[in-house]
């Protein structure tokens, strides 16, 4: 078995893909013509977005959706970069909100946290051990 996808359920798939393109430099791999599903070219593990309508059809018992008006869910998307302050500033410039400023952890890693316009929590971090 291998880890293949992280799928984030959002109110607007195309807007979420566009945000990740503008904020973090990812390229769009695919956007379904219905607009209900799309993927970014994000390396070995695919980062994908699906509509809340698709989530409802996949999760018959319901699910907890993410919203910028609520506390973040207990999960994050961690993006590794050599320049956290620059990535943090760029994300804020294109619509992210700051959840935690850039800081250096006791083990030497530099991290910050932003929230996407749809409410998803994103950690920006240097590689561990550098």
Predicted regions and their residues:
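Conserved active-site tyrosine of GNAT-family acetyltransferases
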Residues: 16-21, 91, 119
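Short glycine-/small-residue motifs
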Residues: 121-124
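Vicinal oxygen chelate
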Residues: 1-5, 27-79, 86-115, 126-130
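Conserved beta-strand-loop-alpha-helix junction that forms the acyl-donor binding cleft
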Residues: 10-13, 82, 106
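N-terminal amphipathic/basic helix or basic patch
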Residues: 1, 8-11, 15
């Amino acid at each position: 078995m291998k880890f293949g996808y992280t799928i984030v359920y959002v109110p607007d798939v195309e807007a979420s893909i566009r945000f990740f393109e503008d904020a973090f430099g990812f390229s769009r791999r695919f956007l379904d013509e219905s607009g209900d599903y799309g993927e970014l070219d994000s390396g070995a593990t695919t980062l994908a977005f699906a509509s809340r309508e698709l989530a409802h059809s996949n999760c018959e018992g319901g699910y907890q959706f993410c919203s910028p008006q609520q506390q973040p869910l207990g999960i994050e998307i961690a993006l590794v970069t050599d320049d956290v302050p620059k990535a943090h500033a760029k994300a804020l410039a294109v619509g992210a909100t700051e959840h935690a400023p850039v800081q250096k952890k006791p083990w030497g890693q530099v991290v910050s946290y932003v929230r996407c316009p749809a409410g998803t929590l994103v950690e920006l971090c240097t590689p561990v051990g550098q």
